[in-house]
Each structure stands twice: as C-alpha cells, then as structure tokens.
Amino acid sequence: MASKQPAILNPTPEDISLLLAAQTHIGTKNCEKAMLPYVHKRRADGIHLINIGKTWEKLVFAARVLAAVENPADICVISSRTYGHRAVHKFAANTGATAIAGRFTPGSFTNYITRSFKEPRVIVVTDPRVDHQAIRESAYVNIPVIALCDTDAPLRHVDIAIPGNNKGRHSIGLLWWLLCREFLRLRGIVPRTPNGWNVMVDMFFYRDPEEIEREQAEAALAKQAAAANAMQESTIEQVDFAIEGAGAGGVNPSVAANLPAGGEQVDWSADAAQDWAADTGAAPAASSWD
C-alpha cells in the first residue's frame, strides 16, 4: 500500500481485519462526485466499495489535526445519528473533548445568548447529512470540520473527510475507536504497541436501551433467586424422627390402666352412666331480681 505517511503510522494487519469485519468498506449505491477518489470499485449489485487505504490515511490525518489542538475541550464531537451517541461519549470520556449526542441545538455556534453556546477549535461529525446544522454553523464562524463520510455524503463545508460506512453501528463505533486511539498515541498518552490501550472497541458500539434493561432485569432476578436459595438452605433444620431409648414404641401406663381387660372392645355408642339432665337436688341460687 503506497502511502506518504511515516511507516510508524501505517496500519497493522489487525487494523485492516477490524475495518473489513466491521464492513467499513461497504458504501451505498449512490456516490457523490467528490467521493469518487475514495471509491475502490462498484460491485455488480451497485454497491460502491471504499478504499480502506484511503480510510486509514485520512483517519491518521484527522488524528494529527486533533492532536495539534492544545486543549482537548476545544474539540467538539457531534452525532445526531443514534448509532454514534455512545461512540462520541466514549471519545469525549477518553480524550477530554466535548460531546454533543442527539439533537444539535441551532445557534450553538453562532448565537452567544443560548445556554448551549460553544466556541470550539474544531468539530468532528458522524454524518454530514444528519449533522448538517452543525456543519453550516461551523462554516459561518470558520470552524474546521472533520466528518465520517459515506459514498453518498455531501462534502460541502467539510475540510477533512474520513471515507467509511457511517450507517452501521459497528463501523461507526470502530472508526471513532480508531480515531480516539490514534489521538491518544500521538499525544503520547498510550504507547504505540498492540496492547498499549486496554479499552475494547466494543465499548464504542451502540447498544439498544431495551436490551440493556432486559439484561439488568435478568441479572436482578438471578441475584434474588440465589439469595432466596441461600436463605432457604440456612433456615431449614434437619428434623430427626428416630426415637431412641426405653420409651420407643411404648404405651403410657396410665392410659393402659383404663382400658378394658381381656381385649374387649369399647362401645362408644352406649348410654352414659350418668344422666346429665337429672335434678341434682341443689337449691337454686338466690336472685336479686325478686
């Protein structure tokens, strides 16, 4: 791969494998004229394939521009696309940049009266089509724009275009992860070794909130079930029904004395020996009502 950048900045086979696995090279059926230099070829089904070598060159170039900014807080990373929300937050957490995820408030770069007013040195957007408001305002106030651009992305007011698939969640997360890693390497924060940065690329991938809630609910139920089982095992006592000693299988002597001799059966239907309704001859009790 012919490149004008230093050999130390060349991609490793692992980096190329990640880009291909995340389908970063898969474009769209539409292709802007300005994006033609970044297209490798067009497939039979009409899908344009992006040159991975160009993607890496522009990625390193963008990282060198960001590393030149003295204060990382002056870098504003923006993503109105849902798949890029987590990626920009992770990028900001690892670099100290300012993240804007979700709807971009109009006037954030031009109207100083708004609460969200910012004056960044450079901005990085996920998709020029979706983040067009931020790009337009940056053009008004002369803020350089770095953008992840698919084959159908308009490059108007975009200063540095990083060609790549900006519609898949894996591709978006990987591009932001590579940009963050290269930024930290150029800053000297992490070494340029295969295991120099211990943050996995999965941390930059978008996750469905419902999936996260489902996993948390399942974990809570499993924890409650484990606690209930532990409590039940600790409270159950083993009862010994075996009776040992002289009294085992014996009969109470006082009860046996009242039983009829000779094994006669007791007639429980016989009349009682005493008439409970008979007059006992006792004088009636005196009453105070008389």
UniProtKB/Swiss-Prot annotation:
Pfam family, one: 40S_SA_C
GO BP annotations, alphabetical order: ribosomal small subunit assembly; translation
Lineage: superkingdom: Eukaryota
InterPro entries listed in its UniProt record: Ribosomal_uS2, Ribosomal_uS2_C, Ribosomal_uS2_CS, Ribosomal_uS2_euk, Ribosomal_uS2_euk/arc, Ribosomal_uS2_flav_dom_sf
Disulfide cysteine pairs (residue numbers): none
Transmembrane domains' residue ranges: none
Cell membrane in keyword set: no
Location of the region described as Disordered in the Swiss-Prot/TrEMBL record: 268-290
SUPFAM superfamilies assigned to the protein according to its UniProt record, in alphabetical order: Ribosomal protein S2
Subcellular localization, as worded in the UniProt entry: Cytoplasm
GO cellular component: cytosolic small ribosomal subunit
A GO molecular-function annotation: structural constituent of ribosome
Record keywords: Cytoplasm, Ribonucleoprotein, Ribosomal protein
Keyword Disulfide bond on entry: no
Function noted in UniProt: Required for the assembly and/or stability of the 40S ribosomal subunit. Required for the processing of the 20S rRNA-precursor to mature 18S rRNA in a late step of the maturation of 40S ribosomal subunits.
Family membership: Belongs to the universal ribosomal protein uS2 family.
Subunit structure: Component of the small ribosomal subunit. Mature ribosomes consist of a small (40S) and a large (60S) subunit. The 40S subunit contains about 33 different proteins and 1 molecule of RNA (18S). The 60S subunit contains about 49 different proteins and 3 molecules of RNA (25S, 5.8S and 5S). Interacts with RPS21.
Name of protein: Small ribosomal subunit protein uS2
Species, as recorded: Malassezia globosa (strain ATCC MYA-4612 / CBS 7966) (Dandruff-associated fungus)
Source taxonomy: Eukaryota, Fungi, Dikarya, Basidiomycota, Ustilaginomycotina
